[in-house]
C-alpha cells in the first residue's frame, strides 16, 4: 500500500493520518499489505503478522462508512465489482455518497481496477459507469494482454508527492511487457469497447433464459451466476470443463470472465454448453427445489 507510506501521505496528512478503509469481501492482492487490505479472513489464514492501520466496512452501507471515518483515515479503497467477493457490483448511490464525503473531507479515493479495468465492463475503467474520478487507480491483468504488468494511475495532487524511485517493482516498466501493453491500449478504441458491451448484452440475455439460473450479477463481461435447486457452482464448473468451457467460481456463484475479443458465435457456443450442463442438472435436481 504505497499511498499510506508515501511522501504524499506524510507531507499532506502528517504521520498519524495513515489508515486505509477497504470493504468486506474485497480482494486486493497477495503481498502482506494487500492481503491486509483484503476484507476476507479466508485469505488471511496462514499469513502474518500483518501491517497495522487497515479497517473493513460493509459494502453499500454509507452510515457505517461515515461512522468508521476518524482523524486517522487518509484513504478508502474499493472495487466497483467485487470479483473474489462474489461478482457483486457496488450500488451507484453508495459510491456517489462515499465519493462526495471523501472529497469534502480530503480523503483519497482508490479504485482497484485489476479485474474490472481495461475494457472488461464495456468501458476502459469500470468506475466510468459510476461517473467516478478516483485519486488513484490500480491496473494489472488485462493491461498486459496475458503478459505480467501492473500500473498505478494517479491524479496530479497525488503525483506531486511522488518522485523518481519513490515506489517501484522488480520488473516494472520492462520493455517487452510495455510493448504488449501498448498494443492492448491501441486496441481499446470505441469500436472494441462497443463490441464488449454488445457481447455482454447477448451473453446476459442468453444466460437469463437458461434453466436453474436464479440471478445474474456483475457488469459487462464480468458475470456472476447464482443457481436454483441447490446446484453448486463448483459442480457446474467441473461439468463445463469436461465439455470444453473454462469458467470460474466466486463464493456461491459461477464466474464468467470471457476473452474481450469474443464473437457472437463464441457467446452462442458457450451458452449452448451451459444449457447442456444445466439441463442435465435440472433433470437430476429434486423437483421441489428446482
Task: Label every model-predicted segment.
Residues 4-290:
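Conserved N-terminal phosphate-binding loop of PLP-dependent enzymes in the Aspartate aminotransferase
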Residues 1:
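Proteins enriched for Cys/Gly/acidic motifs involved in redox and nucleic-acid/cofactor modification
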Amino acid at each position: 500500500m504505497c499511498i499510506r507510506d508515501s511522501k504524499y501521505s506524510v507531507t499532506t496528512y502528517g504521520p498519524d493520518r495513515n489508515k486505509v478503509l477497504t470493504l468486506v469481501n474485497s480482494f486486493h492482492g497477495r503481498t502482506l499489505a494487500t492481503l491486509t487490505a483484503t476484507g476476507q479472513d479466508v485469505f488471511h489464514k496462514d499469513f502474518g503478522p500483518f501491517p497495522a492501520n487497515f479497517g473493513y466496512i460493509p459494502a453499500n452501507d454509507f452510515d457505517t462508512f461515515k461512522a468508521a471515518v476518524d482523524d486517522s483515515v487518509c484513504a478508502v479503497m474499493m472495487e466497483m465489482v467485487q470479483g473474489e467477493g462474489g461478482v457483486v457490483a457496488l450500488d451507484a448511490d453508495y459510491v456517489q455518497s462515499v465519493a462526495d464525503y471523501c472529497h469534502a473531507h480530503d480523503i483519497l479515493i482508490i479504485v482497484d481496477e485489476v479485474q474490472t479495468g481495461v475494457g472488461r465492463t464495456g468501458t476502459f475503467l469500470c468506475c466510468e459507469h459510476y461517473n467516478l474520478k478516483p485519486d488513484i487507480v490500480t491496473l494489472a491483468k488485462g493491461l498486459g494482454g496475458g503478459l505480467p504488468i501492473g500500473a498505478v494511475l494517479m491524479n496530479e495532487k497525488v503525483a506531486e508527492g511522488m518522485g523518481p524511485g519513490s515506489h517501484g517493482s522488480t520488473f516494472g516498466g520492462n520493455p517487452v511487457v510495455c510493448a504488449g501493453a501498448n498494443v492492448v491500449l491501441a486496441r481499446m478504441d470505441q469500436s472494441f469497447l462497443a463490441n464488449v458491451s454488445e457481447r455482454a448484452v447477448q451473453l446476459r440475455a442468453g444466460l437469463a433464459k437458461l434453466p436453474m439460473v436464479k440471478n445474474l450479477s456483475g457488469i459487462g463481461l464480468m458475470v456472476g451466476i447464482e443457481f436454483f435447486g441447490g446446484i453448486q457452482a463448483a459442480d457446474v464448473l467441473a461439468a463445463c470443463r469436461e465439455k470444453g468451457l473454462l469458467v470460474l467460481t466466486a463464493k456461491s456463484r459461477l464466474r464468467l470472465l470471457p476473452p474481450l475479443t469474443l464473437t457472437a458465435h463464441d457467446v452462442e457456443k458457450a451458452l449452448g454448453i451451459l444449457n447442456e450442463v444445466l439441463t442435465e442438472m435440472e433433470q437430476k435436481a429434486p423437483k421441489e427445489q428446482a
